[in-house]
Amino acid sequence: MLKGNYVNWGSSGQAHALRNALNAMYRLDNTEEHVKNYRPQILVLTGNLSERNHLLNFATSITKDSCLLISAEVIVSDNPDSLISTVTDEEAKCTAWLAKNKYRAFFHAVSSASLSDGVRQLLQISGLGKLKPNILLLGFKNNWKTSKLDDIAEYVTTIGLAFDADFGVCVFRCNSENVTDSENVDECKPLMDQANQEEQRQTNNTELKTSINDCQTFTIEMVEDEFKSENEPSNNAKPKKTICQNFSRKNKTFKKCNFYLKKDLFRQKVKHATIDVYWLFDDGGLTLLLPYLLQLPKSYLEGAKLRVFTIANNKELEHQETSMATLLSKFRVGYTEVTAIPNITKKPDQKSLDEFQESISPFLGTAALSESELLAERSRTWRHLRTREFMLANSSDASLIVITMPIPRRRVCSDLLYMIWLDLLTRGMPPVLLVRGNQRSVLTFYT
């Protein structure tokens, strides 16, 4: 008997699934919120999934398939209305990609004339009822030094918009160079490429000279495993993922190499991991909650040791450490060490000042950064430099650093200076997660 093609005729089970989900949403919308029921619902700006899905891996370690996770992309175009059908098609394609790669997440894309306007749309419309994100996670802008000032302003504006929308904000800097993008590029093609192609068809311009499908050769150097266990001898360490030798398809050629794909980063568990938390300001407890969740099962840092650092005056070091230890015990957050940072406001070392001067030197004398602003913000700059000194001295061996993020103050601090601060707090470190809550309490003393 011949077997025909699969045809979905529908079923009563599918109809009941939709009705049950709808009823559950109604019940949730009428449920009174309480700090004990708080869940981190994350909107992560991954952009193209095949390029930045390591952000999705990291977010999954927090949500653990039990909280809302939305992967989002903003397609910047001069004519965003013309891309509505393209966005719909790509949402379906990327949703299938998420299911194939076993991510419990949704994908959402919008087309907009600018990044900040697109993020504003996402912050307003993502989710439904009370099942909507309350944290915005985005990657660090690594190319800020070579970017236009308008692009830096767009990035900082994005952070400010999230605070205005009463979101918590997380900025993640991987600081890893031994990862690459080479897999699944055809399955989830960048939406920006399609936006460019759509614009070119409308303006009758010439075809794009380069695209993902036109790549001729892709070569990657051999790298070492940065997540290697200390007990394993380095000469026997081998990458757990490799690309097959002399693989070619269409116009692509992948040479023999050993490296880590971004799809695997933050999916493999780290042995003997340590999370360092720099709780510098009270933001409702989000800076403590996220590393606590990263300690739990189903995380790449499962079972990690937690070291907490806070600030104090020299005369109050012991008292502050004792108070913090008591507070963590009340919150039922396990920790291995509590340390108070002394003299956070004193003048930094000359090496740190020289490093800061090197960062600002290309912009001095321009309208983007004035001497008067540097003088007015000197105390905050020194504070960030002193924090960096302490992080370099105490957390260079950590698996992850979680630190309270400074808030951008509009009309007081320029976007460029704020970007320099973020860079100084994260450059040359292990992976760093900058966190700032929305002052909503996410931890409670009571059971």
Annotated model-derived regions:
Residues M1-T447:
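Membrane-embedded alpha-helical bundles that form conduits across membranes
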